[in-house]
């Protein structure tokens, strides 16, 4: 996809339309209409609808892995890194709710087929990053060694991702408060 600012605008519009109508029901014309542009003009920036899906998913997954990597590289204690990971995940969700919704509701095999990068590998890298922080916490003595952290990471990501189903900005609770509550729940469950 060409031109960064326009790319972002197109991806955001595509995410809104696809989240509302579903990937299969969305036509390029629907996205062009949402952008108030001609369908032919949209094709200047994209090749196919699959190109849009690929862009949406890869962007979210790459941001997730990058943010987690930045947290891993800090000198913080593992418990603080976990708190920051929860906050980062929910902030990314909050700022990209439509694209996040597509990632969570569309068929991952379809997503992986359209992706130049392996979407499943990016997801595994993200889980591995969390697991590495928990292992660091076990080694430092901050976290209990009696836990199966592979299962815990899957549970945490399930909890954080399920936020997509119930969280609404208008409900009155800031996403930062949700993050604080979730981080407390997680850390109380794993600390020694």
Where are these regions (language model features)?
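N-terminal intrinsically disordered/low-complexity leader segments
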Residues: 1-5
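Helix-turn-helix
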Residues: 9, 17-51, 55
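Short hydrophobic clusters on alpha-helical segments that form packing/core surfaces
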Residues: 10, 14-18, 64, 89, ...
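Short coil/turn segments at alpha/beta junctions that flank glycine-rich nucleotide-binding fingerprints
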Residues: 20-24, 74-75, 96, 140
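Short helix-capping/turn signature of helix-turn-helix
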Residues: 46, 105-111
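Hydrophobic alpha-helical connector segments
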Residues: 55, 69-95, 153-156
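Amphipathic alpha-helical packing segments from all-alpha helical-bundle domains
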Residues: 62-65, 69, 95, 114-140, ...
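Hydrophobic/aromatic-rich alpha-helical bundle segments in the mid-to-C-terminal region
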Residues: 98-105, 120, 138-185
